[in-house]
Amino acid sequence: VVAIIGPSGSGKSTFLRCLNCMEDPTGGQIIFNGVDIADPKVDINIHRRHMGMVFQHFNLYNNKTVIQNIMLAPVLVRCQDLKKAKRHNRMLPLTNLFRKEKQEKIEITTSKSQIVAEARAKAEELLKRIGLEDKADVYPSTLSGGQKQRVAIIRALAMNPDVILFDEPTSALDPEMVGEVLDLMKDLAKEGMTMIVVTHEMGFAKEVANKVLFIDEGQILETGTPEEFFGNPKNPRLKDFLSKVL
């Protein structure tokens, strides 16, 4: 778990969005699963399947029910793969006429109805995990802020990501709602989920993070373990920042 802290406007959220290529970095590399995903030649959508993101303001679709929000990405991605496989098989006799090395037919072992059924079962399982199974068929507008953010987190989990990016997941919540979201994130950390978290929750960073980064004016000024970072900060700007927030 990597926690990213810093003053408002320092570039924390921009840094996170660059990791998911929602904003184009101006230089450098972003290596994810051995691939530089900042390379324009790389299909970023393939890698986004393995990188979940949770936003400050939840970003749930208000015109879809809770369970439809959770099912949307898994169904869309798997149906796209199914469509590509069917198209490949349909065109195979023609394309093999012009190839020395013949391609094989793709074995199709699923259907759209099966994909939807499996996604719904997974969504129901995730809702049960956070105690919101009774909210499956309601719309996000009926949920509290804490409930919306927990739904947003399990929506990211529905894709079985390798890493989840959290952009200030508690900053838009009432203080009494913060605990339920942090508890879920702590559970994910205990289960070994890789997380990069932009946060103002210093207690969470101290307790859960393996590494803490301090960003100011778009620069990473200091990194370290929570013990080093909070107990013996070296950068003067970080010392000043911590003196105001702790």
What are these regions (language model features)?
Residues 28-39, 87:
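Conserved ABC transporter NBD signature motif
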Residues 164-167:
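Catalytic Walker B motif of ABC-type/P-loop ATPase nucleotide-binding domains
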